[in-house]
């Protein structure tokens, strides 16, 4: 979150910008050029277009502070864009289409940043869907909301929510919508029902960075451990820290009754994970309870915006090709002795304290609103001073991570690639 000091600095910069505008109209034109270049960068999808737009931004920005401000302000969003019920498909590298329906408020205003909510359906053991949105069998009118963008992707028997192809597709769909719609990056939530609820657990355990909160309904995290269901994952409850959950299960659910989920809830409590657990009295495998529960659910979302760059971050990973990042930390190399690697990082001013277990190398991503780049940054790993130096901010680093995330609150001007001392 933006610190008070940075807010004051921003107000000062705004005042200076206004003064300069009166005296030197050329600066305003430069900002206009920056807005257009950022828009081109935001919308570029091919490697060639991305490379070209990145080079143009580097050439146009007089310094990294200006480039950061341009990216933080974001692209220009058009009012001439689809509203109401829309449908599209993300096409994977192997040609597989991943269709999704998205619902845009009829009075969508591009000047407003909208919360965005994904809704994952149940019943994933079905053939691949044809276009038309039939995967959401309850009708889309019930999902339409004037204050948010709703996204309903499709899952089927070759693409369960917890399969690798969906782990790639869901973030890609989110980025596709962010290219053209003004999304509040800190209010993107993931909700799911039945198998969709289990899918929500998957993203909470493995890919939480871009989500504010997770809402699994009548699902079960234990399914993710089952290798026959395409999962076979090891679940690390430390990965759920900093991302709250709203969990609902019925007492008489024929598939996932409260009694079967209760051991997982106990672990959440022991680990200190922020969560709400609602056990529906006499509830079955349905969402008949939803009208009564909705006010509390909506308040939960309001109360839990994402903190994109928390001071303390923990991540546990058993691989480094994927599922190895949380916010501004990444595990790059494990010891290879079958133990999962655990990385615990705390930031206090320019001092970073790291605890690393079963890890050989890791990366720290640095944001200029959290660190003073005019002073040395110190990193202490397992009690040993490992790094202390003035860190140089790089435009290309900023743009590379901006391209990956398309997130105006996850902007990094430097990265530290560090090894764990013996």
Give the ranges of each region predicted by the language model.
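Bacterial N-terminal signal peptides
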Residues: 13-24
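Active-site machinery of serine-nucleophile hydrolases
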Residues: 116, 120-179
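C-terminal catalytic histidine-bearing segment of alpha/beta-hydrolase fold enzymes
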Residues: 254, 258-352, 357-358
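A domain-start/cap signature at the N-terminus of enzymes
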Residues: 29-114, 385, 393-411, 422
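Primarily recognizes the serine-hydrolase "nucleophile elbow" in alpha/beta-hydrolase
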Residues: 186-239
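C-terminal beta-sandwich/jelly-roll accessory domains of carbohydrate-active enzymes
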Residues: 316-422
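Gly/Ser-rich "nucleophile elbow"/oxyanion-hole loop immediately N-terminal to the catalytic nucleophile
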Residues: 106-112, 159-195, 205-211
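Short beta-strand/loop motif that positions the catalytic acidic residue
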Residues: 240, 246-249
């Amino acid at each position: 979150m933006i610190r008070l000091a940075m807010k004051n600095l921003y107000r000062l910069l705004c005042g200076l910008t206004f003064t300069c505008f009166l005296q030197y109209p050329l600066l305003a034109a430069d900002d206009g050029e920056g807005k257009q270049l950022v828009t081109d960068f935001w919308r570029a999808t091919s490697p060639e277009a991305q490379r070209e737009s990145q080079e143009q931004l580097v050439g146009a920005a007089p310094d990294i502070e200006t480039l950061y401000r341009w990216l933080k302000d974001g692209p220009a969003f058009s009012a001439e864009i689809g509203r109401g019920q829309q449908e599209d498909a993300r096409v994977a590298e192997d040609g597989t289409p991943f269709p999704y329906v998205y619902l845009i408020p009829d009075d969508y205003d591009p000047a407003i940043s909208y919360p965005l909510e994904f809704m994952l359906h149940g019943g994933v053991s079905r053939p691949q869907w044809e276009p038309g949105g039939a995967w959401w069998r309850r009708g889309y009118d019930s999902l339409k909301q004037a204050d948010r963008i709703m996204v309903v992707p499709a899952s089927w028997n070759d693409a369960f929510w917890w399969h690798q192809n969906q782990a790639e597709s869901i973030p890609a769909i989110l980025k596709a919508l962010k290219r053209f719609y003004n999304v509040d990056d800190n209010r993107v939530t993931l909700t799911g029902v039945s198998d969709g609820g289990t899918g929500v657990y998957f993203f909470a355990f493995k890919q939480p960075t871009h989500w504010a909160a997770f809402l699994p309904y009548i699902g079960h995290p234990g399914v993710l451990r089952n290798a026959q269901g395409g999962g076979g994952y090891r679940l690390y409850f430390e990965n759920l820290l900093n991302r709250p959950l709203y969990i609902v299960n019925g007492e008489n659910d024929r598939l996932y009754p409260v009694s079967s989920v209760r051991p997982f809830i106990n672990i959440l409590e022991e680990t200190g994970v922020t969560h709400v657990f609602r056990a529906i009295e006499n509830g079955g495998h349905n969402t008949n309870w939803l009208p009564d529960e909705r006010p509390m659910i909506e308040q939960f979302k309001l109360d839990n915006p994402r903190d994109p760059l928390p001071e303390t971050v923990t991540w546990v990973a058993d691989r480094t090709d994927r599922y190895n990042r949380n916010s501004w930390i990444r595990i790059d190399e494990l010891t290879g002795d079958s133990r999962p690697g655990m990385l615990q990082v705390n930031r206090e001013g320019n001092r970073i304290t790291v605890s690393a277990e079963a890890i050989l190398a890791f990366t720290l991503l640095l944001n200029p609103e959290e660190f003073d780049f005019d002073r040395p940054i110190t990193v202490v790993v397992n009690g040993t001073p490992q790094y202390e130096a003035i860190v140089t901010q790089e435009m290309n680093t900023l743009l590379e991570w901006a391209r990956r995330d398309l997130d105006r609150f996850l902007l990094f001007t430097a990265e530290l690639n560090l090894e764990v001392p013996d």
